[in-house]
Amino acid sequence: MTDIVDELKWRGLVALSTDEDALRKAFADGPVTFYCGFDPTAPSLHLGNLVQILTMRRIQQAGNRPLGLVGGATGLIGDPKPNSERTLNSREVVAEWVERLRAQIAPLLDFEGPNAAIMVNNLDWTQGLSAIEFLRDVGKYFRVNKMIAKEAVSRRLNSDAGISYTEFSYQILQGMDFLELYRRYGCTLQTGGSDQWGNLTSGTDLIHRAEPDAVVHALGTPLITKADGTKFGKTESGTIWLDPEMTTPYAFYQFWLNADDRDVSKFLRIFSFKSHEEIEELEKQTEERPQARAAQRALAEELTTLVHGADQTAAVIAASKALFGQGELTELDEATLAAALSELPHVKVAEPAPVVDLFAEVALVASKSAARRTIKEGGAYVNNVKVAAEDAVPAKEDLLHGRWLVLRRGKKNLAAVEVTGG
């Protein structure tokens, strides 16, 4: 079996480690019980979180036991943001978000077998803790000079916003999580993003002080960057969430399908569970025939299936093909069609209007005269049917599910019209 540290490094998933050689030995002697934490600071996880979940999945598949921690306690506080204090959410909201995050993490881990995953909530060991117990049993192991030196804290201390004692103490709570999981489950490794390195090492430092004989580790994954300099996991429409109500499966699929050729190799290694040979073959195809987008299609299908399931993925692929004239729009169910069209430029009209008006209104062309030229040149389509006449007006019978028209200029320029009249 491939050494899991070598595997993670090949995939570009190792940025920082407390002691790589010691960690490698721990895995060799294994199994290792490890954890990664997720704070409920939003009602859904996002692609940055997905990196961590899939890293957990890889380490579990190598024979180790994952603990998925959802921070019912740390989520009530929040780790320090770079420039300002967080707005505290109510206990009720945080409790609801805890359950939503648990439901998103659980399908991606294996909860059966000898190394079955376990979900934990740090509220379980903090809510009954008195202030005196916290200060005597945990706080005494932390040194303020080291806490101040953590990047997240020092940055805030040097800003106009400053930092509250609440957020300053966040690293103590996260360190306490590692200690508690070490004592309860024999957990000896915490994984997380390299931007959380200060919090990760708070845990290892605490354990070294409280349990001097313990051997524990931290592993940090790198910040994912994109070749064009834009932030990973965001589009013009906003953050890519795992919750299908916040980011549709269609938009999720399209995010990966639209990956830059310069990024797709990195994304395959980080997110895909394909073998080295399969990934290298897709990399070769991208280099030789980039227009085929074979790597992007493979990545989009695999990840959409992982997060949203095979049925949703099949519907999304059918919608994607149909929108570009490679399938029947009439065969798409209303929910799938509506989700796909919501990602396109679109307008609402009371009644079907002349095609030239619709093309201009939705900005597929610059003007009505440009729309007429497009029709004359054979480049205008409504519901994948070429528009033959410059004065064409869609009939109500043409509306998909009684309300939608899909406009296309050429092969790739799409827009939607929603007809709202009865």
Curated annotation (Swiss-Prot):
GO terms for cellular component: cytosol. It catalyses: tRNA(Tyr) + L-tyrosine + ATP = L-tyrosyl-tRNA(Tyr) + AMP + diphosphate + H(+). L-tyrosine binds at residues 35, 170, 174. The keyword RNA-binding applies. It comes from the Bacteria. ATP binds at residue 234. A motif ('KMSKS' region) lies at residues 231-235. A motif ('HIGH' region) lies at residues 40-49. Keywords: Aminoacyl-tRNA synthetase, ATP-binding, Cytoplasm, Ligase, Nucleotide-binding, Protein biosynthesis, RNA-binding. Residues 353-419 form the S4 RNA-binding domain. GO terms for molecular function: ATP binding; RNA binding; tyrosine-tRNA ligase activity. It is found in: Cytoplasm. InterPro entries: aa-tRNA-synth_I_CS (IPR001412), aa-tRNA-synth_Ic (IPR002305), Rossmann-like_a/b/a_fold (IPR014729), S4_RNA-bd_sf (IPR036986), SYY-like_C (IPR054608), Tyr-tRNA-ligase (IPR002307), Tyr-tRNA-ligase_bac-type (IPR024088), Tyr-tRNA-ligase_bac_1 (IPR024107). One of its GO terms (biological process) is tyrosyl-tRNA aminoacylation. Its main location: cytoplasm. Pfam families: SYY_C-terminal, tRNA-synt_1b. Its EC number is 6.1.1.1. Homodimer. Catalyzes the attachment of tyrosine to tRNA(Tyr) in a two-step reaction: tyrosine is first activated by ATP to form Tyr-AMP and then transferred to the acceptor end of tRNA(Tyr). Belongs to the class-I aminoacyl-tRNA synthetase family. TyrS type 1 subfamily. This is Tyrosine--tRNA ligase.
